[in-house]
């Protein structure tokens, strides 16, 4: 499967009469986005605001973040099974408005939604302090059930991102990158002397607002499967969860997975990247046994030499992580885990909730329990009403001027366990 990704670099975002891209500036028609969102009768009101790097702006509670993209050539359309009919994606040509996002925020869905600061000392922890953000502030109708509100907000974000992405349809990209993964036997024959490496991609699927979707299917409902990495770049996987914000894999992070990106960069040089093994993180032990068994069988069946594993969330999913590690090792593969840590505020507790002797190679994406001071900002997009009850916050943490103290895990993507962040841990 071969995908050309045309990157259109966005250096600013402004409101305009027409949603278009001109000389690196993304112009968006505010009313058209509002009208699109208000087609859902579960939504009471919508506002659209802009947040740019360096501005004194805080965004909260953030639900999902999405990079606007559009299919130019090839099968299917963005977000199959969600905003478009189910059809295999990952081939042809796709344009991305790099440096911009569409994000949803507003009244909290669950307690695990996050904060983005566009400037100040906290901005360095979040990648979205460096992007030009179209912020959709959503308010649900009175009495709407929580799951229905999550679904409505999720669809508003995806539809708005697809709408904005179409502005790049006829724009000549600043850069075109080609990604190609061939059918398995052909791929193996191409580099027979290089180690065969697969990426085991664990999707959040604990339920109770901890959900991820594969071609529109709730990840709880499938068993491990094998897929082309480029399918993920075309929106085959979308976020639908309110997991702890620090390691929440937003839809943006699925589209821009750094593990996939780095495997492509090293493909044909020192490794043979053969594809993605997709699995989930269901809560019941029987599900964990079943799915980790199948991950191990796929690794054995495909003759994989090396495996990289990422998880989403912490606590319960740490067991899936360790079971996958153990069974991939038993299948004959060398395994590296990529995860974040939660050792407590004093740093003395066990960093993950489970362990196995086979987990002897780990890349850390940082720890989420460090307390930082969040200074007041001139503007808040959304609201700060829920800071005390959000993961990382605590009773009495917020001050009258809007400043507060909280753990890093309240920040979107601060310790995201696929490496799209700036934190890590080192031995001294």
UniProtKB/Swiss-Prot annotation:
Q: Give the sites modified to Pyruvic acid (Cys).
A: 242
Organism domain of life: Bacteria
| Single annotated GO MF | sarcosine reductase activity
Q: Keyword Transferase on this protein? A: no
- For this protein, what post-translational modification is recorded in UniProt? The peptide chain is cleaved into beta and alpha chains, and the alpha chain N-terminal cysteine is deaminated and oxidized to form a reactive pyruvoyl group.
Q: Give EC number(s), comma-separated.
A: 1.21.4.3
By its UniProt entry, which Pfam families does this protein fall under? Gly_reductase (PF09338)
What keywords does the record list, in alphabetical order?
Oxidoreductase, Pyruvate
Catalysed reaction per UniProt?
A: acetyl phosphate + methylamine + [thioredoxin]-disulfide + H2O = sarcosine + [thioredoxin]-dithiol + phosphate + H(+)
| Keyword Oxidoreductase (UniProt) | yes
Which NCBIfam families does the record associate with it?
sarcosine_GrdG
Known role: In the first step of sarcosine reductase, the substrate is bound to component PB via a Schiff base intermediate. Then the PB-activated substrate is nucleophilically attacked by the selenol anion of component PA to transform it to a carboxymethylated selenoether and the respective amine. By action of component PC, acetyl phosphate is formed, leaving component PA in its oxidized state. Finally component PA becomes reduced by the thioredoxin system to start a new catalytic cycle of reductive deamination.
Q: How does it assemble?
A: Heterotetramer of two alpha and two beta subunits. Component of the sarcosine reductase complex, together with components A and C. PB is substrate specific.
Instruction: From the Swiss-Prot or TrEMBL record, give the protein name.
Output: Sarcosine reductase complex component B subunit alpha
Give the species this sequence originates from: Peptoclostridium acidaminophilum
Q: Which gene encodes it?
A: grdG
